[in-house]
Amino acid sequence: MRSRILAIVFAARHVAALPLAAEDAAATLSLTSSASSTTVLPSPTQYTLPNNDPNQGARNASIARKRELFLYGPSTLGQTTFYPTGELGNNISARDVLLWRQDAANQTATAYREANETFADITSRGGFKTLDDFALLYNGHWKESVPEGISKGMLSNCTSDLLFSMERLSSNPYVLKRLHPTKDKLPFSVESKVVKKLTATTLEALHKGGRLFLVDHSYQKKYTPQPGRYAAACQGLFYLDARSNQFLPLAIKTNVGVDLTYTPLDDKDDWLLAKIMFNNNDLFYSQMYHVLFHTIPEIVHEAAFRTLSDRHPVMGVLNRLMYQAYAIRPVGGAVLFNPGGFWDQNFGLPASAAIDFPGSVYAQGGGGFQAGYLEKDLRSRGLIGEDSGPRLPHFPFYEDAHRLIGAIRRFMQAFVDSTYGADDGDDGALLRDYELQNWIAEANGPAQVRDFPAAPLRRRAQLVDVLTHVAWITGGAHHVMNQGSPVKFSGVLPLHPAALYAPIPTAKGATGNGTRAGLLAWLPNERQAVEQVSLLARFNRAQVGDRKQTVRDAFAAPDLLAGNGPGYAAANARFVEDTGRISREIAGRGFDGKGLSQGMPFVWTALNPAVNPFFLSV
């Protein structure tokens, strides 16, 4: 009985009390009966390092008890990192599910209501007769669930090759790589005269000059689409044009059936279909690759939870960043990736493929913690640095991410310095913090965190890196690919369908002229389109501003401000100021005299810290 009470106490810490009805308990994944009587103890009134705690014995006993009750369980939603189990782990999972349901309830109800209104409006206007009619999906609709609306230019410029290519440098930057002039081979050939006409040079010269880039979704060929739906497994070649200095598409290869290769010189509808097929693959990738942005911070937090006292300053910050984090896998398994669930209802490839994909990435070495540091990752793919080719003239994702991470890093540096004392060149305070060192050892040991800094942690810069990366994932990287991004950018129809509804062509010229017998045959019908937008709208979190849950609010929890002293409060004030400046610049974006924003014919705002939640929201 005592262990059950302790589990509930630990699970409730840092979370406001929630009244749980019996039906909620029954509906939330076998919530234990004792959780319905959860009481909440206050968060620590003072965060302190273990060596400064006057009650180290009780502190150590509390950690030992957590280790007994919070265990590493099997991975769920693909074979990646451990998911919590044990009495405390199960209670925390159930607690987070309830928090998630509470946060999502209004968004879900609003999106469903707006979906019904949108469908009624579309049908009253005669439905989709041309591609232009997809504007009926958005014009005047989704004002509450997606108050910022879809990206300016995403509809009006949807046939633009520059829009298509620049999405790789903004909405989905995690799959693009530059082909190294000597280390990478050309993935497929493109007819020489076509390359010459498009680029005024040769494919080999582009490669040798470091001007050739690849997105490879050929791995999707191993998955079988659902009945009545279809999918290619596209590879896309892109190039940096030496004349215009623009990043442009060169060719798309389908890798299925007769394996057609399309280029911008093809019939305009054939080429547009190729881009649609590519984007269908890309949407699958972004939605399932982002699962790693859940599992990586989860396992880092799990290791910390088993080794750090709740009174440790670092634990306080990590708990804040991991608000409701353990809801996503059980909720996803229950309603999104279950057979016939929301995924199967909307996407071409089945939920079984979606679950398999992140595990496949992880099995092939993906999901490394330090490898995911922003600049290290981008440099490894040749997107920054000039070792393998000329600099990209515009890289919207990196431009915004670099500034946001800079603000996070400044906060974390000040937080670490205020916690461990002014940095005088002696980082011995880190080595004396046995809880911190136990965390690093746990992460490298039982937790099996891939590519985590080695134990012992000797330099506070390493700790700053770790904390910065966790906060960047929860409040930045995740939202580039999920949260509000799909409904505003990467999932906007007609260019980004979740499923294709006609077979992949066996010859060019099969697209007609944009009538229902042409391109519309591959695209969702009116009801399917509304269902796609509704699902993606439910990923958005429109209320976080009113709830003080944005990235700007990440470190402003009252218990953290009260329990960490004036240095922490000053760091938070600086962070709020920095992110406010970033937010105002992003929110104020529009088109320049050339009709471009950050070099793109659409306005990208996915990293606005005053709009995004600070946590892993969905």
UniProtKB/Swiss-Prot annotation:
N- and O-glycosylated. Its cofactor is Mn(2+). This is Manganese lipoxygenase. Changing residue 347 to A: Changes the stereospecificity of the enzyme from 13R-HPODE to 13R-, 9S-, and 11-HPODE with almost complete consumption of 11-HPODE to 13R- and 9S-HPOTrE as end products from oxygenation of linoleic acid. Residues 36-58 are annotated as: Disordered. Pfam families: Lipoxygenase. Residues 36-45 have a biased composition (Low complexity). Three His residues, the carboxyl oxygen of the C-terminal Ile or Val residue, and a fifth residue, usually Asn, ligate the metal, which binds water to form a catalytic base Mn(2+)OH(2) for hydrogen abstraction. GO terms for molecular function: linoleate 11-lipoxygenase activity; metal ion binding. Lipoxygenase that metabolizes linoleic and alpha-linolenic acids to 11S- and 13R-hydroperoxy fatty acids. At the end of lipoxygenation, the intermediate product 11S-HPODE from linoleic acid is then transformed into 13R-HPODE as the final product. It also acts on alpha-linolenic acid producing 11S-HPOTrE and 13R-HPOTrE with subsequent transformation of 11S-HPOTrE to 13R-HPOTrE as final product. Glycans are attached at residues 60, 91, 106, 116, 157, 513. Belongs to the lipoxygenase family. Manganese lipoxygenase subfamily. It comes from Gaeumannomyces avenae (Oat take-all root rot fungus). Gene3D superfamilies: 3.10.450.60, Lipoxygenase-1, Domain 5.
